[in-house]
Amino acid sequence: MKKLITLIAGLLLVALPVGLAGCDDSDKEIYNDGRLVTDVVIPTSMTVYRGMEVSVSGYGFAQGDAIALRAGEDLPAATTVASEKLLTFVIPDGAADQTVYKVVLNRAQDYQVLGSSKMTVQLAIDVDLGKTISGNWGGDAVIRGRGFMATDKLLLEQGGGKFEAPVKGADDSSLTFTIPQNAADGDCEFTLQRGAEEQALGSAKLNLSLGGVTVPDKEGATIKGIVHLAGQGIADVLVSDGDLITKTDANGFYWLNSEKRNELAFVILPAGYDVPTVKAMPQFWQPCTLDANTVEQLDFQLLRADNDSHTMLVATDMHLANRNTPKDYVQFADGFVKELTSAYNSAAPGKVYCLNLGDFSWDHYWYDTKWALPECKQSVEDFNFQMWSVMGNHDNDPYVASDFGAEGPYRQHMGPVYYAMNIGRIHYIMLDNTEYLNTGGSQGTVGSRNYNRRFDDRQLAWLKEELTHVDKSTPIVVGCHCPLYSYSGSGGVSVALQTQADIDKILSCFAGFSNVTFLTGHTHVNRNIQSPTYANVYEQNIAAVCGTWWWTQQYGNNNVCTDGSPAGYKIFTVDGTDLKWQYKATGLPIEKQFITYDMNEVKEYWATDATALKAFAAGNDMRNRDKDYSTVGENAVYINVWAYEPGWTVTVTENGTPLDVKQVWSKKDPLHSISYDIPRGAANNGTLTFPSTSCMHMFEVTASSASSTLEISVTDRFGNVSTESMTRPKALTTDVTK
């Protein structure tokens, strides 16, 4: 029998007394001008579960009395009378949550309203998870509470993924469940499910043990551990300290003769597996906590994953620093984070990942605005998918004038600065190609934050060793912050690292691999460049999430990069070894891949707009900007195709007649100019921090008149088509949707 709850007046803080007279139950509480029972108090609110027995004390109860809950219609409740002083009824299955019920006593033809109560109806009540639930994978654990049923389902949620924990049984005071194999150490949300109903039970920390597994010491090893699936060791998994790479034995054990230089160790995720996730951060690394001469055990849990097909969201240059108007973190939350959580948080675990290509933070403001890597991590906690990261030049400690030392906070909060993982059948390698010099930096003093764009020799040695474990036919995706290449002039390619020798050092590591894609950021523009000297290497330099460092919202009510690309990210769709990609402008439909400019209107704006004329007159960085489009002919139209790359086609027709389309290599984008350069120049004496850059994906056509309508179609290398019917004249506006 379920435990009884006795509702006695002396224990109630707030109650409604039974009325004294009346013949209807709308305001008066006694039928037939007399009381059936007395001294009854019904609480104004109750938290109950269906099937729960509720006892009411009073005087005058009789065998045959019945209780109904009245909210419009009567809902009969099974009733028993223990004595003339105690009646018990059962909360019926039809009781509705957050409903005010009148508790009606029925006796033959008479009835009496005993009182009214707002009922909070739950699946279970008095649930106590405790702060920590300890146990082993496959072992039993208990949740205290009342109202559980053996047929209930228990759902656990960790890192955005929900999975079932089998219910073993239930009694009057608890529910017993089996800890599933895909549970992980750390915070966990618990949800009770019964049919179509769910109830959040709360959260607790899972403290899961390996059941006494101890990895034996080995001579010379300072780091040891086990790589396991639910406590069972996994053989042939690579583990590294950033200098050495080793492989687990048949028991899943590993040993590293480590100097602990990086003060951490990490697992190189094997295909078919995943790692647990905590607040969007993949748990693939562990910090060392003991000195270099002391042996410590660092264990790694893996989870099964069906991720041969997955989506990889590639984003870069968030530059979160608690500055700008509106604040950068507000723009980030309202734009990028909101869009990704809405679109991808409901995806199954192992189906969506994110790559962050660096400049998550902004070193210059770490100490001034109290916003550094920990705050940046908090800004993405709502992601129900993993965000894997590399560091950018702005993710270094600006008080430290050495590359390795300045990386310390990153290793502490984000993990290794270079590593690798297999997600599905793609081998991802995350590298660090900023050598942070930071001349003049010291504790309390921000240095010059200067850096070199190169891969250091230790990292290259590690990379060469890591690649010996990868089949040459495997597609390779390399993420790093700084680009390898840039454009020079009309389609020419130049080296963006320090020297050609730096290019050769990194790209020669991939000799024999046929499909190597580098994903980079740093520039805040879109560029796609085939390596001119390494046929197997293709680079995609991706525009920034922050656009122009979060400035254009203030001036243009938009978020635009210096080449006119709307701030955004790239979506990679992976099916086995096949990769496809599209640029996604934040806040715009993915079908929109370009913007058009009626250059007649642009030139008119340059010649007549008061703010533009003020900015041009200010000189400094705005000197000669009045001549931006002085050589552009009449009836010209510009088309900025944001993510254009080899294999795309741009076609334009006027009244059914095709127009000649030519690529323009040296012009600035009008949208960025009116969203930042002109208003900022006018307000700041012509001085610009982030001026428009030459756009390398601009196209031009010349129409036959100023008022014709143009039909424009852009087709990418995968057959995706974007179109616009451009009605002219078309006004120049900061609205990126136009």
Model region roles, listed by residue range:
Residues 81-90, 170-177, 669-700:
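Aromatic sugar-binding surface patches on proteins
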Residues 537-643, 648-650, 696-703, 709-724:
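Binuclear metal-dependent phosphoesterase catalytic core
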